[in-house]
Amino acid sequence: MALIEDRLFTRIKNRVGRAIADYNLIEEGDRIAVAVSGGKDSYTLLHILETLRKRAPVRYEIMAINIDSGYPGFRADIIEEHLREHGFVAHMEKTDHYGIIKEKRRPDSSYCSICARLKRGVLYGLAQRYNCNKLALGHHMDDFIETLLLNQFFVGSLKAMAPSMLADNGLTTVIRPLVYVPEEDIIPFSRNNRFPVLCCCCPVCGSADQQRKRMKELLKTLEKENPFVKKSLLKALANVQPRYLLDRRVKY
């Protein structure tokens, strides 16, 4: 089934295209591994990048990568069927992350942080195995803003995410082309196109990451007084003025 090319599609496509241009996310000859978790964000990213690939002035290739972490009930076959129906080159990686996490996790710690680290390492390895020089992740505008607030409130750091950065392995460039796309656009886009959205089936899915949920609620409250608060916070990430901060490592 082809994507529904309505105004919402056009808006998302244009914002992804602008992010690619602003941060030089995609270049001639790139091979891009797109991490597809089964969530609305990664499906949206994959389909928009494929749409742009067919129309872009530069040539690049994409492939989908899914990691099955071994959580009971996770239906990787549903993702695989969707990818096959839409003609995507894909690799489905089966792991026992669930078993590792159960063994290594401290009783008072979250599944999420350990799971994310394990997945990240596998994603980097798969990108190298398939000669992909870039790894595309589905973090959207709200993720950038919430991460900024989380680091300020709970870590004491002015840090968010980067739209493009060299991974820890020094070989793979991680890109986040949805940086300009708000979650409120992705939700109806995914629903309208009937993407088979799946839960990761983690035992604490839906209850973990309470701090991020608190940031979402805070932003909703702020938006009632200032509808442009998210745009302003995102703009702030591109308008850093170190001279007016307290980092003693910065020399003037």
From Swiss-Prot:
The record, for InterPro entries, names: Rossmann-like_a/b/a_fold, TilS/TtcA_N, tRNA_Cyd_32_2_STrfase, tRNA_thiolation_TtcA_Ctu1
Reactions accelerated catalytically: cytidine(32) in tRNA + S-sulfanyl-L-cysteinyl-[cysteine desulfurase] + AH2 + ATP = 2-thiocytidine(32) in tRNA + L-cysteinyl-[cysteine desulfurase] + A + AMP + diphosphate + H(+)
Question: If you read the UniProt record, what top EC class would you report for this enzyme, in one word?
Answer: transferase
Q: Where does this chain mainly localize?
A: cytoplasm
Task: Give the source lineage, highest ranks first.
Answer: Bacteria, Pseudomonadati, Thermodesulfobacteriota, Desulfuromonadia, Geobacterales
User: According to the record, how does the cofactor bind?
Assistant: Binds 1 [4Fe-4S] cluster per subunit. The cluster is chelated by three Cys residues, the fourth Fe has a free coordination site that may bind a sulfur atom transferred from the persulfide of IscS.
Which keywords appear in this protein's UniProt record, sorted alphabetically?
4Fe-4S, ATP-binding, Cytoplasm, Iron, Iron-sulfur, Magnesium, Metal-binding, Nucleotide-binding, RNA-binding, Transferase, tRNA processing, tRNA-binding
The EC number on file is: 2.8.1.-
User: Which sequence ranges are marked TM in the entry?
Assistant: none
Which gene is annotated as encoding this protein in its UniProt record?
ttcA
What name does this protein carry?
tRNA-cytidine(32) 2-sulfurtransferase
Cofactor entry: Mg(2+); [4Fe-4S] cluster
Which species?
A: Geotalea uraniireducens (strain Rf4) (Geobacter uraniireducens)
GO-annotated cellular components: cytoplasm
One GO molecular-function annotation for this sequence?
A: ATP binding
Keyword Cell cycle on entry = no
Role of this protein? Catalyzes the ATP-dependent 2-thiolation of cytidine in position 32 of tRNA, to form 2-thiocytidine (s(2)C32). The sulfur atoms are provided by the cysteine/cysteine desulfurase (IscS) system.
Q: What else is known?
A: The thiolation reaction likely consists of two steps: a first activation step by ATP to form an adenylated intermediate of the target base of tRNA, and a second nucleophilic substitution step of the sulfur (S) atom supplied by the hydrosulfide attached to the Fe-S cluster.
Task: Report the SUPFAM superfamilies cross-referenced here.
Answer: Adenine nucleotide alpha hydrolases-like
Subunit (UniProt): Homodimer.
Q: In which pathway does it act?
A: tRNA modification
Locus of motif PP-loop motif: 37-42
GO BP terms, alphabetized: tRNA modification
Name the residues that bind [4Fe-4S] cluster: 112, 115, 202
Protein family membership: Belongs to the TtcA family.
